From Swiss-Prot:
Residues 1-112 form a propeptide. The modification Phosphoserine is found at S87. Glycans are attached at N102, N141. One of its GO terms (biological process) is positive regulation of cell division. The keyword Membrane does not apply. This is Interleukin-1 alpha. The modification N6-acetyllysine is found at K82. Gene3D superfamilies: 2.80.10.50. Disulfide bonds: none annotated. GO terms for cellular component: cytosol; extracellular space; nucleus.
């Protein structure tokens, strides 16, 4: 009499064979050397369902991306927690990677021109004149005086009547309330200090009245006024990395720092 095949026995044998093959494959992967030559310990039970990303020390110090690529952070169950698109040919260093991994929101990395785009959309409104007929001295005890009808310079003087007296008007910004935008006007005139480029002399620009509203594209006459103790700094709104500065035997200009002098003492009108 023919023996009826035991289907359950065949399934059992098949399962055993697959289990052996799976064990062999797992063993092969476990013993295979990583492409990045990095070993990882077992995932602790308390780390389940949490964000997983490579340690910064396990990544080359500076990675160069020559193509568009996304960085994705996933949980242990495969759920995408956040991702970020990296721009074409962007250089990504340790700090960038760490910031991306710790960022709680998805966002596109903005180009370096983003701050300038932000500034160009800002609007400034005059509040009031906050200083009248004040004198500006630099740390070399030089006083700002008129060089000619168009430019200013700094010199050591004995008679303060030679000094330029400034009125200072304060503005408020539509988007940034952390700074104090101001405009400098030569007292009893319609001449306003107007910035150009780095190492270029500031101009005395004539306007019929103090601008009530100034937009981001017309900010050459505005400076962010900062004080540190008795020192005063005027940072160009049009060029946020440049200060109004004095330079030995030269005109008042825009500069980043030494050898130009960027800090001033304001002598208030005592009248």
């Amino acid at each position: 009499m023919a023996k009826v095949p035991d289907m359950f026995e065949d399934l059992k044998n098949c399962y055993s064979e697959n289990e052996e093959d799976s064990s062999s494959i797992d063993h092969l992967f476990l013993n295979q050397k990583s492409f990045y030559d990095v070993s990882y310990g077992p995932l602790h039970e308390s780390c389940m369902d949490q964000s997983v990303s490579l340690s910064i020390s396990e990544i080359s110090k500076t990675s160069k991306l020559s193509f568009k690529q996304s960085m994705v952070v996933v949980s242990t169950n495969g759920k995408v927690l956040k991702k970020r698109r990296l721009s074409l040919s962007q250089s990504i260093a340790d700090d960038n990677l760490e910031a991306i991994a710790n960022d709680s929101e998805e966002e596109i990395i903005k180009p370096r021109s983003a701050p300038f785009s932000f500034l160009s959309n800002m609007t400034y409104h005059i509040i009031r004149i906050i200083k009248h007929e004040s004198i500006l001295n630099d740390t070399l005890n030089q006083t700002i005086i008129r060089a000619n009808d168009q430019y200013l310079t700094a010199a050591a003087i004995h008679n303060l009547d030679e000094a330029v007296k400034f009125d200072m008007g304060a503005y408020t910004s539509s988007k940034d309330d952390t700074k104090v935008p101001v405009i400098l006007r030569i007292s009893k005139t319609q001449l306003y200090v107007s910035a150009q480029d780095e190492d270029q002399p500031v101009l005395l620009k004539e306007m019929p009245e103090i601008p009530k509203t100034t937009t981001g594209g017309e900010t050459n006459s505005l400076s962010s006024w900062e004080t540190r103790g008795t020192k005063n700094y005027f940072i160009s709104v049009a060029h946020p990395n440049l200060f109004i500065a004095t330079k030995h035997d030269n005109w008042v200009c825009l500069a980043k720092g030494l050898p130009s002098i960027t800090d001033f003492q304001i002598l208030e009108n005592q009248a």
